[in-house]
């Protein structure tokens, strides 16, 4: 068996990725999120596949087909809510995974980091298109508002929006193409995940100290397979708690009304995991400026490898940078809260201040703190 594991062309790849992979001996539970995301992705693809068997991508029947899944299909309600809450779980894990990468300086593996950013964008696109599919009120208006942002692009904007819609509004053509893209994108995500892992295994994992760990490596199996199973249990428990006790906790009540183009909901907002970016978009009074800020809020991640000025890789021994990272975390929580609030007096100002602080912290304060910490080291 050992011989086969190490010699068979296909099993050899699995062996080098999950069994005999040399892993730093000191990585903490923060390194569990990659495997948790993998499990989450598999769950999303499986539940999505079963949902696609019963769903119809047509404006007249989409809403009732989702109702049919919940009422008449065996365990349809479970599959539907696992899929919907699985997306929330996916984003919680992604954000924690990115936060870990920033804290421990994992972004210095620039290829792995950049593919990670592509993955984030692909997952966001997939989640957005999936949210449109039930053709509820918030689905319809969310799709209308977000796709309409492209009309801010000079000269070609309006044509581009109508081309994406396949008509003059979000209609059957839009739903059909969104379903097609929502189905194919997860497989593209799987390919990107493989590339992400390929580049990661070229360099080996980072570790909490941020130092080279070549002198102290242990095999991935059994040490980290066992450790990951603990993570799977926690994640499984959390998602089942959500699905079985409060499946609509993170959803929007408006989405239980069928889409009605003649009736606009009082507060149009996306799912909770996009609210921080939505708040940044809304805090700029200009349409094109808002779209640019929205893109910048995600793409600013690509600047981390170039903005790393510290002599230390990890933030473990950098108190000023640590404080700034927690300021950034609180800032994102405030943006998420603001994104879900109506556009009126105190919220507009809070949103603008939080948006400004977000970019200020990442682009100016973090590099400055790195330089200050380098100076302190010399003293």
Curated annotation (Swiss-Prot):
Its cofactor is heme b. Keywords: Electron transport, Heme, Iron, Membrane, Metal-binding, Mitochondrion, Mitochondrion inner membrane, Respiratory chain, Transmembrane, Transmembrane helix, Transport, Ubiquinone. The chain crosses the membrane at residues 33-53, 77-98, 113-133, 178-198, 226-246, 288-308, 320-340, 347-367. It is found in: Mitochondrion inner membrane. A ubiquinone binds at residue 201. Gene3D superfamilies: Cytochrome Bc1 Complex, Chain C. The gene is MT-CYB. Heme b b566 binds at residues 97, 196. Belongs to the cytochrome b family. SUPFAM superfamilies: a domain/subunit of cytochrome bc1 complex (Ubiquinol-cytochrome c reductase), Transmembrane di-heme cytochromes. Component of the ubiquinol-cytochrome c reductase complex (complex III or cytochrome b-c1 complex) that is part of the mitochondrial respiratory chain. The b-c1 complex mediates electron transfer from ubiquinol to cytochrome c. Contributes to the generation of a proton gradient across the mitochondrial membrane that is then used for ATP synthesis. It holds the Pfam family Cytochrome_B. Heme b b562 binds at residues 83, 182. GO terms for cellular component: mitochondrial inner membrane; respiratory chain complex III. Heme 1 (or BL or b562) is low-potential and absorbs at about 562 nm, and heme 2 (or BH or b566) is high-potential and absorbs at about 566 nm. The cytochrome bc1 complex contains 11 subunits: 3 respiratory subunits (MT-CYB, CYC1 and UQCRFS1), 2 core proteins (UQCRC1 and UQCRC2) and 6 low-molecular weight proteins (UQCRH/QCR6, UQCRB/QCR7, UQCRQ/QCR8, UQCR10/QCR9, UQCR11/QCR10 and a cleavage product of UQCRFS1). This cytochrome bc1 complex then forms a dimer. Signal peptide: none annotated. InterPro entries: Cyt_b/b6_C (IPR005798), Cyt_b/b6_C_sf (IPR036150), Cyt_b/b6_N (IPR005797), Cytb/b6-like_sf (IPR027387), Cytochrome_b (IPR030689), Cytochrome_b_C_euk/bac (IPR048260), Cytochrome_b_N_euk/bac (IPR048259), Di-haem_cyt_TM (IPR016174). Binds 2 heme b groups non-covalently. It comes from Dasyprocta fuliginosa (Black agouti). This is Cytochrome b. GO terms for molecular function: metal ion binding; ubiquinol-cytochrome-c reductase activity. One of its GO terms (biological process) is mitochondrial electron transport, ubiquinol to cytochrome c. Its main location: mitochondrion.
